[in-house]
Amino acid sequence: VDEMTDVRSPGAERRVSSTWVREALAAGDVETATALLGRAPSMRGEVVHGLKRGRELGFPTANLDPDAEGVIPGDGVYAGWLIDHGPSVGGASAPNLPEVHRYPAAISVGDNPTFIDVPRRQVEAHIIDVTDIDLYGHTVDIQFVERIRGMVAYEGVEPLIRQIADDVVRAREALV
């Protein structure tokens, strides 16, 4: 048996631990979580039907099943990646599928406070510059790269649309 020393994050006196990673994610600090994990924090789940509000606003989203695997970061809007593994079969990716596809995304985590009919916290990803893709029933990974902003309730649909458009620009810039 070899004795190992604690792993410390560069520039930090604190020992790297799952507690620290969970605290960072709860605060929406995906950059710290990435440094601690050595990879971007992510979730995996099946794309399910939502209220289709994103599509109505001009920003269609892939909604993750509420039982997705992984730790959900704090409420807010994030830049990240959606990795499509293809159609699910019994909750897992189907075998012998063609290549995996990776798309830049603006990701919303929260209960969409502008609207009162959102029953629970959601994770939904808008694929940047792609509108004609059907991901329903596909297994996807959502990787969180950078937090763009916190969740905000808007006074109507028009201010929300303007903000989402800005979020998409900022997400695109964060991912280049």
Enumerate the predicted regions with their spans.
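Classical nucleotidyltransferase
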Residues: 1-60, 151-164, 168
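Phosphate/ribose-recognition catalytic cores of enzymes acting on nucleotide-derived substrates
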Residues: 50-176
